[in-house]
């Protein structure tokens, strides 16, 4: 089985999964978080080198105060658990997105986690928190515009690679496969620059129920695709 080098996942359906079982939405997020821990081990076992997950978008602040507070509590717990997950998998972890909106203790946990894991190289795990692709591109272009103004970058030398170097994902290869769980079929402002030639896989399975068997199925479907990158397959 040809395993994608980089898999990105939109972790969708936690709340709906809980509601269908007559449980609070927060319980769905707890189960989804626990599943993410296991999927990191599964991804490593399958030989995938890069994993990026959409954990909390810039739009998710619009949810109820109770739900957002619950998610922040969950983030605090999960970031601490990530130390063990990182050690077990020799996994480097980076948080992408604008972390300045989070409470200071969460920001500090992020910095500690990134520092702890910086030298691991068997799996690269990006967690998108307070992330939106339009926001990422806007922030990146502001930095590039400032560098142009300062004479560090010449406008006529700007390429796609230059733009990519100003994004949160700089230095990381674009995803080969995007998985979105729970039946929705849209990007929801996730990695819009990076997904230009990515294969998409949509499943009705909610994130808390998305286990290794579903992951393998997604990879098998990926193997059936003919990735032409805009070209034409030679007969």
What kind of feature is each model-predicted range?
Residues 1-235:
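Flexible, compositionally biased loop and terminal segments
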């Amino acid at each position: 089985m040809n395993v994608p080098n980089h898999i990105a996942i939109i972790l969708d359906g936690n709340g709906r999964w809980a509601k269908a079982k007559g449980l609070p939405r927060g319980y769905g997020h707890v189960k989804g978080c626990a599943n993410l821990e296991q999927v990191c081990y599964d991804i490593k076992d399958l030989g995938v080198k890069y994993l990026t997950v959409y954990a909390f978008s810039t739009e998710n602040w619009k949810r109820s105060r109770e739900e957002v507070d619950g998610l922040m509590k969950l983030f605090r717990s999960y970031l601490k658990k990530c130390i063990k997950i990182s050690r077990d998998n020799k996994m480097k972890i980076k948080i992408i997105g604008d972390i300045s909106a989070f409470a200071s203790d969460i920001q500090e946990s992020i910095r500690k986690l990134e520092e702890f894991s910086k030298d691991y190289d068997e799996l690269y795990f990006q967690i998108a928190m307070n992330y939106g692709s339009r926001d990422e591109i806007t922030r990146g272009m502001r930095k590039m515009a400032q560098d142009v103004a300062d004479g560090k970058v010449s406008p006529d030398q700007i390429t796609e690679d230059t733009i990519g170097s100003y994004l949160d994902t700089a230095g990381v290869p674009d995803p080969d496969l995007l998985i979105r769980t729970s039946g929705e079929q849209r990007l929801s402002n996730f990695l819009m620059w990076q997904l230009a030639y990515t294969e998409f896989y949509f499943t009705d399975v909610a994130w808390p129920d998305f286990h290794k068997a579903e992951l393998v199925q997604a990879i098998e479907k990926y193997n059936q695709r003919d990735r032409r990158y805009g070209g034409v397959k030679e007969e």
